[in-house]
From Swiss-Prot:
Protein name as annotated: Small ribosomal subunit protein bS18
Protein's gene: rpsR
Keyword Amino-acid biosynthesis applies: no
InterPro entries, per the entry: Ribosomal_bS18, Ribosomal_bS18_sf
Protein source organism: Ehrlichia ruminantium (strain Gardel)
Molecular function terms, GO-annotated: small ribosomal subunit rRNA binding; structural constituent of ribosome
PANTHER family: 30S RIBOSOMAL PROTEIN S18, SMALL RIBOSOMAL SUBUNIT PROTEIN BS18M
Entry's family note: Belongs to the bacterial ribosomal protein bS18 family.
Amino acid sequence: MLKKGKKTGSNSSGGTAYSPLAYLKRPYFRRSKACPLEQCANEDIDYKNKALLSKFTSEYGRILPSRITSVSSRKQRLLSTAIKRARYLALLPYC
């Protein structure tokens, strides 16, 4: 229902007009879908391999998601368990 005194058809957001370009998706760059751990098969995912595990953690010590590292889901699960095990044994910091 419309109440008296309320304007209809005007833009309620202020001085900006509707722009269909504002709702378009932002362009993004496609990353390669290849798993970086598949290329170097001689390195296995182990909790004692600090150099490999530190590549998949942020500078704050958090585990990077697979959409950033482009690691397959199976390797991501192995990485997360190895990182958690290395944290528990004080080989990697928690933060």
